[in-house]
A protein has these predicted regions:
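Juxtamembrane helix-capping/reentrant segments at transmembrane boundaries
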Residues: 47-67
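Juxtamembrane membrane-interface segments at transmembrane alpha-helix termini
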Residues: 38-48, 100-108
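Loop-to-helix transition at the N-terminal end of transmembrane alpha-helices
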Residues: 24-38, 53-59
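Membrane-proximal cytosolic segments adjacent to transmembrane helices
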Residues: 1-6, 96-130
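Membrane-helix boundary elements
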Residues: 8-27
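Alpha-helical transmembrane segments of multi-pass membrane proteins
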Residues: 16, 29-39, 65-73, 94-102
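Short hydrophobic alpha-helical membrane-embedded segments
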Residues: 1-9, 63-67
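Hydrophobic alpha-helical transmembrane segments and immediately flanking/interface helices
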Residues: 78-106
Length: 130
């Protein structure tokens, strides 16, 4: 039992080191990724297109998002050696906008009305990160 705890602690520390601070932006990204996956599954059920293969590919894509955050963090701290995390922050904002728009698309496919203000905010973030 203790070995499992140590391994999990080691993995958690390594991941935390690679992705940088577990700050509000990173937590928001985790939340958006989880909500996008859940709404994607709900949409697939609603449209009767649920597929374990598509779901597995979706999970792999979500993992790649966090790999790219880690790459951006390494660029910031070990290649560019800049204060703060401008590259990491930009990558997180890009994926926040991307995941947010995907969430809206998934929910809209369920015939749920989407507040225009929310759509505009996410589209503006997306434009700013392009």
């Amino acid at each position: 039992m203790y070995k499992v705890k140590y391994v999990l602690a080691l993995v958690g520390a390594a991941v935390g080191y690679m992705v940088g601070d577990i700050d509000g932006l990173f937590i928001a990204l985790i939340i958006f990724v989880v909500i996008d996956y859940i709404t994607g599954v709900v949409k697939a059920i609603y449209l009767r297109k649920l597929s374990s293969e598509v779901g597995a590919v979706g999970i792999l894509k979500k993992i790649c998002i966090f790999i790219l955050v880690a790459v951006a963090n390494v660029i910031d701290h070990y290649i560019m050696k800049v204060g703060g995390s401008p590259c990491r922050t930009s990558v997180i904002f890009f994926y926040l906008a991307n995941e947010g728009i995907s969430i809206l698309e998934n929910i809209a496919a369920l015939d749920v009305p989407i507040p225009e203000k929310l759509r505009n905010i996410l589209e503006n973030i997306d434009k700013d990160t392009q």
